[in-house]
UniProtKB/Swiss-Prot annotation:
Other observations noted: Multiple telomeric associations (TAs) in the same metaphase spread often result in multicentric linear chromosomes that resemble little 'trains' of chromosomes, hence the name 'caravaggio', an Italian train.
The name this protein goes by in its record: Telomere-binding protein cav
Subcellular location: Nucleus; Chromosome, Telomere
Short motif (Su(var)205-binding Pro-containing repeat 1): ranges: 220-224
Superkingdom of origin organism: Eukaryota
GO molecular function: telomeric DNA binding
Region (Disordered): 141-163, 186-248, 291-319
Any single GO BP term: telomere capping
Any one GO cellular component localisation term in the record: chromosome, centromeric region
UniProt keyword Acetylation, yes or no: no
Keywords tagged on the record: Chromosome, DNA-binding, Nucleus, Repeat, Telomere
Designated gene of the protein: cav
Amino acid sequence: MSGMQISSYLRKYLADEDKKIREEFKESDPNNEMILWMHEKTRITEEDLARPYTEDEVRELCLRTKVKVNMTAWNCLWEAKKRFDAKGRFERKSEEFINLMYLKAVRRKMVQPYPEDYVAQRREIAAAETKKDNISRLDRWQKQKRRNQSAHATQPDSQDNEVVEIHDDTNRYSVSQAVALPVLTPSDLSGIGDDEDEQQQQHHHHKHRSGFQNEHADCPETQMRCDQADSGRLPNGPTNSESDPDYYMFGTQLSRSIQPTSTQEADDQLACPETEMNESWVRCDQINSESMSIGPSINSDGSISFQNSGSEPIDVDVN
């Protein structure tokens, strides 16, 4: 795309603008140094206007730049509208009335249309400013592209170096493990741990059984059941799973209607020393057997009695 042809009016306009800025901001003043530097970077030159666009630049500008059309520039009707809006003449009015007011403003010369030469000159200045802005955009985008390409070019090298370092560390770690760990042949591993588990299980079973027998050695019932379990013979009839001696040791009275029945209950209680009642307790005529109850008792009809629930057990020493 060819460059923009600069006219004599535009050349004179740019020269006048540059002269006006330099007269207002003197170079002798150090405070104006930044303003003059910005003016030098942003002012429109003939080289900028003569620079042609490539096809890629035109495509990039069309895709990345928003097109805006200013319909109010050099429009006399817009100026008339601003005057009527300031007076409130268009409030709650129809479109026909508004158009008639525009015609009235032009006929009475409230506003005058801009000359075509003036509009063409203003458009030429706006086109020069737009091209300067587009050149600045293209230069900025080009710098960003080069910066991104250099960043992508250096990033794979650093990643390759990190991968090589990790690979070297892994190799050194594997080599150190291979040197530290001894190599065992299948012949060395044979026989290791074969009989240890069986011996430990047998020892644990024997220890558990001997401990259980020692704890219940005093009770003939437990001894009989242990002997039957060892010999593989268990009684066919129902057995009392609850520990009956515990209830008699703590003085808890159970009704005969709810006590568990067993065929071996009488023999077990007579044979076990813990369930035998001392004869000295029977000879004591002054002791009430009901006062020995610590907690609530159950009557024969199934009701719960709280009689003497707060009494404490009395120990009588006959000897």
